[in-house]
Every structure is written in C-alpha cells, then in structure tokens.
Amino acid sequence: MTPKKMSKLDSNKYSKMKAELKHPISYQKICQIKDAAINTIGYSSEAIEYALKTSLTTYLFIDNEIEKLENKISELYLSLDYKIHTIKGIGILTAAGIASEIGNFDAFITRNQILAYAGLEPSKNDSGEHNGNGKMVKHGSAYLRNYLMNAAETFRVYNPSISDFYWKKRNEGKHHRVALSHVARKLVNVIFTLEKHKVDFNPNLVK
C-alpha cells in the first residue's frame, strides 16, 4: 500500500484489511501509520505499488505453504508413538525434527550411542580420557545436534531443576554454549528414557 492510499485508509477499509491479516495490527497503530503517511514526502507509482502487491502475494503464498507443511509434519509425527513432545518446553515440530534424525530408538542400545550420533559426547585428550572441559566432538548428525542444542534452550527455561544445573555450569566458569551442551546431554538422557519405556515426561523426575 502506497503512502497516498495509506493516508486515505478509513475504519471500513481497516476492518477489511484486519480480516485478511494473520497477525492483525491495532487500529491505534494504523492511525499512527496513517498520520505518518499523510506527512510523507514522496510520490505514488503504479509500478512500485504493483511490485509491492506481487511481493505481498508471494509472501502470503509461501507463508501459507509453510503452515500447511508444518501441519502435515505435526500430523505425521502424532500418528507415531513418540514421547518427545511431552517434555515441557519442546514443541511438536522440534520433537518431530529430533525423531526424524534419530529414527528407530531400538537401534540404540545406550544413550551414549545417541550422544555419539549427535556429536554431543565430550571430547577426549591424548590419553583417551575425557578432558572435562565440556567441548563437543561435533561429528555425527549436525542436524540432530542443532535440534538438541536449540531444544536445550527451552528445556532449561521450562524446567527449574535443569535451569539450576545450567547455572551451576555457568558458575563453574563454562561459557553459555558449553553449559548448554551439558543441558543437551541431560535432554538426551530424558528422551532416551521416555522412548525406551514409552512413558510421558514427568518433570518431578528430572534432576
């Protein structure tokens, strides 16, 4: 919408526009934009207006396709017997991403195998012992590692005991990403337990 058209926007046109928007703008905000449009020094161009309309149409189409794809992913995930989404702070799309990367949990005998697959196990020094600095080896599935690290952020926010654990690591002098990798390992432990025993998440059992 050009400044010229914006300056002529009335309450009826606003109501129509509001109905078409996924995230409506308040009428007060519209009035502020309208006042700014009235005082804008510029010119009206049909070419620019057409380009804006085309860009908006493309954006809305892509946004709608993404929404349909996300709905399909959620539908497929929920049709399977995964328990990852029951963890407080982890949404269905994130859970679906983790599940898609791990696949069949029966293929993993121990949780350490999942840590290794995600490249989240601690690195070792030349003697073959864990060096204790919390650094990840970063081999394995980068996608799974990213899903788990991102999920670890909300996992610590929504679970007080995990938040305490995170800050304990920070107070030990570890940087955010290192402390978060420790949280991600705890998250893998929780996921492994839920999927192996097919039980829902119980925040009271998280330590």
Name what the model sees in each region.
Residues 1-207:
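A detector of single, family-specific signature residues
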